[in-house]
Amino acid sequence: HTPGHTEGSVCLLARETGLLFSGDTLFAGGWGRVDLPGGSAEAMVESLERLARFEDGIAALPGHGRSTTIGASRPWLDAVVAARSLEI
């Protein structure tokens, strides 16, 4: 459960294949919108903090756009975690 974009947002991790289906939580270069009904910047920060714990080699397949990896997302993920805010 990775709320933030919406209350019911989820990400699915297939550890055996190293694939993270990140939905509308994590995209190449950023995160999903939080200005929709049920969206929450605070919940998104908490969700991104959980995803930031994954290994850099995990491939993220978002609901839109191109794929990325946790490692490629590390600079902005670490900034969000350090600030505990999407205002980075």
How would you label these PLM feature ranges?
Residues H1, T6-I88:
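Metallo-beta-lactamase
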